Amino acid sequence: MSLPTVIVLASGRGERFAASGGSTHKLQARLAGKTVLQHTLDAVRASGLPWHLEDGGHPGMGDSIAAAVRTTLLSTPQATGWLILPGDLPLIQSDTLRAVAAALNGHDVAMPIYRGQRGHPVGFSARCGLALLNLKGNQGAALVVRSYTAIELIVNDVGCVTDIDTVDDLRTAERLMHGACGSG
């Protein structure tokens, strides 16, 4: 049985990070000796799931998701689904990726929940493919999530809700990596 593909979104401009004092694009910012994006990709690789990096510079998140789904369908026409993961979640755990992927076996949409907060990746079954292909502009996949029955997975992974939008977010991630704030 084929596995869903993790789509790592890396097309955004990162304007809030620059506005907060960042001297580089947020995905290239250093965190514990590696870039933010490298940490995210390390977790994706460790999950064992197939993946695709979408860094094509599309005008909006919807365009990026649609382009990535289109690309993965060309290489895997019988795709079982997709996990949409922003590239700025450097603390995401590979176990969370696998849990969301497994939940797609019986559900159209699956998303992790950490302490009551919805996180990423959001998983979509193949039934959602056409809706994802039709996304455009700055709107992400929230409308698709609302159009299907979703399962919420309770996870012990602060990384699914720890994105890097500002320099302060980067500092918070650094503290979390070193256990100063705790994650459980």
Predicted regions and their residues:
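Conserved alpha/beta core of the MobA/IspD/sugar-nucleotide pyrophosphorylase nucleotidyltransferase superfamily
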Residues: 2-6, 134-184
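Short aromatic/basic micro-patch
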Residues: 30, 91, 123, 163-164
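A general structural signal for well-ordered alpha-helical segments in protein cores
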Residues: 37, 62-65, 97, 129, ...
